């Protein structure tokens, strides 16, 4: 809220296109809500991670995908930044040929839901999915922008035993859980210590991992061989790409290039990042 005048209040908020807007509403329509004091959620559009907090402490981290900013519909697909409340457990819905299960609404058309699936038999006359669910396309995009505006959350349990299904089942009885969507504009990527252990499949693997027993790798190749993050700058490890299942950090040159762009932009403005 910015100011009040004659029964009207001027407010400022992001719209569904992630544009900051101001406008006047009747003061009588504004109510104060105390957010849930047990659980809270942060979705970071830069890291493409969902952070679940309990009583002020980080409980777990999940991979997610927010709205894509590429293509002709980038403004429409952008996930709005700001602070919201989880307001309704709406359940599964169709978005084209994608079935998005366990959806929880937090802002107009924006929902938080399980990573979508494509069903082999499509849907029946009642809108129910038919056949076998294939998550490969959307699951492989976790950790990157990929959605139409919603927040897609990982389906498989992480190392802590959490997934979107855990959120769906355990947060449902809670009221007014705050979800904060952090923007990525003007922010630098975190630099990883070169000595940080990474792992790869020496038998033709194409990705590097944060754990020697990543769930995305077939058991016959486990445990994976150890390298360091610094090794990724030299051959043959410079051919590897980050695994999104275990949340491997971006490659060193990607981080350096992004941060250089941010530094140059701030230099032009005479500011410090």
Question: Where in this protein do the model-derived segments appear?
Answer:
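Structural recognition of the beta-strand scaffold that forms the well-ordered cores
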Residues: 41-44, 50-53, 60-62, 85-87, ...
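Beta-loop motif signature
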Residues: 1-6, 10-14, 204-223
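SH3/SH3-like beta-barrel superfamily modules
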Residues: 1-27, 232-243
């Amino acid at each position: 809220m910015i100011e009040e005048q004659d029964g009207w209040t001027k407010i400022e908020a992001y719209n569904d296109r992630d544009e900051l807007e101001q406008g006047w509403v009747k003061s009588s329509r504004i109510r104060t809500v105390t957010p849930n004091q047990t659980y809270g959620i942060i979705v970071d559009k830069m890291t493409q991670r969902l952070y679940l907090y309990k009583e002020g402490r980080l409980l777990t981290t999940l991979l997610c995908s927010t709205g894509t900013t590429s293509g002709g519909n980038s403004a429409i697909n952008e996930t709005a930044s700001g602070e919201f409340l989880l307001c309704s457990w709406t359940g599964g819905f169709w978005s084209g040929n994608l079935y998005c299960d366990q959806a929880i609404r937090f802002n107009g058309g924006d929902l938080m839901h399980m990573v979508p699936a494509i069903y082999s038999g499509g849907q029946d006359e009642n809108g129910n999915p038919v056949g076998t669910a294939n998550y490969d396309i959307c699951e492989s995009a976790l950790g990157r922008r990929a959605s139409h505006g919603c927040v897609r959350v990982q389906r498989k349990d992480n190392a802590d035993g959490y997934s979107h299904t855990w959120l769906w089942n355990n947060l449902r009885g809670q009221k007014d859980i705050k979800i904060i969507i952090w923007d990525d504009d003007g922010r630098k990527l975190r630099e990883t210590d070169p000595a940080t252990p990474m792992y790869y499949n020496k038998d033709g693997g194409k990705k590097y991992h944060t754990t020697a027993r990543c769930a995305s790798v077939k058991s016959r190749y486990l445990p994976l061989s150890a390298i360091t993050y610094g090794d990724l700058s030299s051959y043959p490890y410079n051919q590897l790409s980050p695994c999104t299942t275990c949340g491997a950090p971006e490659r060193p040159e990607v981080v350096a290039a992004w941060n250089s762009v941010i530094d140059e932009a701030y230099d032009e403005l005479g500011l410090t990042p």
